[in-house]
Amino acid sequence: MLSPRRTKFRKQQRGRMRGMAYRGSTINFGDYALQATEPCWITSRQIEAARRAMTRYIKRGGKIWIRIFPDKPVTMRPAETRMGSGKGSPEYWVAVVKPGRIMFELDGVSEPIAREAMRLAAQKLPIKTKFITKAEEYI
């Protein structure tokens, strides 16, 4: 699973997910892409599950690019702990995804195969997504 090798600080504030994604919202590597239509935190486990689903479906052909990286730590307190005594310890990592963000790109396969692979990947993610092609993007 994906996680940063080292970070400047162990813990982060939660922040807010307002507005659209302007960076990372165009297809740069492949011919087909999966685009987020809602804001969400996507965990490294969800990214890995989606990647596996796509890889298993396209088998040997094609190349996959993961365009999001989980660089935000999410902290949790132990169960049945009283309030106070500081922030919890980091438990897992998330990628902050805004609407319009390209999450996965795919190349080297036909459009029906790419569409089905992206559909399988989208089922593993907690948000609504959209399948887009490079041809559609520049109309």
UniProtKB/Swiss-Prot annotation:
Family annotation (Gene3D superfamilies): Ribosomal protein L10e/L16
Keyword terms, alphabetized: Ribonucleoprotein, Ribosomal protein, RNA-binding, rRNA-binding, tRNA-binding
Pfam families xref list: Ribosomal_L16
Record's keyword annotation contains rRNA-binding: yes
Any one Gene Ontology molecular-function term assigned to this protein's record: rRNA binding
Gene Ontology CC annotation, any one: cytosolic large ribosomal subunit
Subunit structure: Part of the 50S ribosomal subunit.
Function (record text): Binds 23S rRNA and is also seen to make contacts with the A and possibly P site tRNAs.
Protein name, entry field: Large ribosomal subunit protein uL16
The species this protein was found in: Rippkaea orientalis (strain PCC 8801 / RF-1)
Gene transcribed to yield this protein: rplP
